[in-house]
Regions:
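N-terminal secretory targeting modules
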Residues: 1-85
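Catalytic His-Asp segment of secreted/periplasmic serine-dependent ester chemistry enzymes
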Residues: 37, 183-256
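Charged helix-capping and loop-helix junction motifs
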Residues: 152-162, 194-200
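A short helix->loop->beta-strand "cap" motif at the edges of active sites that frequently abuts
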Residues: 170-174
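Second-shell loop/turn segments in exported
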Residues: 111-115, 144-153, 166, 189-194, ...
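Conserved SGNH/GDSL esterase-like catalytic core that processes O-acyl groups on lipids
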Residues: 75-158
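Alpha/beta-hydrolase-fold catalytic nucleophile elbow
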Residues: 139, 178-179
């Protein structure tokens, strides 16, 4: 018969210690590999994030450069600003009518009438649909303030509901809404309701932000009613201003 070999206590302990060391070392090595992979993944994510950031910054920088070049070309007369509105229409009142009256826009591209308010937008929806422009501008306000339309449940809500009728038939168009251009101080003195420009514009801007529409701030080009751009009535504009206004609109769109 073969005799069973009995390990001495010291040999057993040594074997157990050896196995324990192997387990610990294996665990350590596994942890190191996992930790290395995790660190590597984090590093790669960081590198990718920085690369994406650089691409965005470069894209933004190139866009800014192109816009600066375009602005310079427009100001120098190398580019006709009104040619950039070939596929655009503008809804509005008598102020907007100036674009066709002074022959800057074709009459069919100016969906406006004297004394119009935002409530008249619906009158032009069918024409907008038939033209299907890529850019749709809106410019109202003087008559709206005169009639106190903000008292009818909120000017911004009313304006939005009107624009949505246009969006429904021209879903691919970019929507651009002008701030109300202030009348002169003398004109406001005669008609105090026109003094609510800031109040109305705040609502127009909030409406645009809510709906992802483009808001055009015209306060600088009219100098809050003090610029030399007005006809004798202090409300309507002289012919040269329409070029300035068009530049402000199109450059605002390009900078988005």
């Amino acid at each position: 018969m073969k005799r069973k070999v009995k390990l001495k206590p010291k040999a057993k302990r040594a074997g157990i210690i050896f196995l324990a060391v192997i387990v610990v070392l294996s665990g350590f090595l596994i942890y190191r590999v996992w930790s290395h992979n995790a660190t590597l993944a984090q590093g790669l994510d960081y590198i990718q994030e920085q690369e994406n950031k650089k691409v965005k910054e470069l894209s933004s920088s190139l866009k800014d450069k192109k816009n600066a070049e375009m602005e310079s070309a427009i100001e120098s007369g190398q580019v006709d600003v009104f040619a950039l509105f070939d596929d655009a229409v503008i809804f509005g009142d008598s102020r907007a009518m100036g674009f066709s009256v002074y022959h800057f826009f074709p009459e069919s591209h100016v969906l406006a009438s004297s004394g119009a308010t935002i409530k008249d937008i619906s009158n032009w929806v069918n024409q907008a649909q038939s033209m299907n422009p890529s850019l749709i501008f809106f410019s109202y306000g003087v008559n709206d303030m005169g009639l106190g339309l903000d008292s009818e449940g909120g000017y911004d809500a009313l304006y939005q509901s009107q624009i949505e009728q246009v969006v429904k038939v021209c879903p691919d168009a970019t929507i651009v809404v002008n701030s109300i251009i202030s009348a002169t101080p003398a004109a406001i003195e005669k008609s105090p309701r026109w003094d609510k420009v800031d109040e109305y514009n705040k609502k127009i801007k909030a409406m645009c932000e809510k709906n992802d529409w483009i808001y055009v701030d015209n306060s600088e080009i009219c100098q809050n009613g003090n610029a030399d751009i007005y006809q004798a009535d202090g409300v309507h504009f002289l012919q040269p201003f329409y070029t300035t206004w068009a530049e402000n609109m199109i450059m605002t769109v390009r900078k988005q």
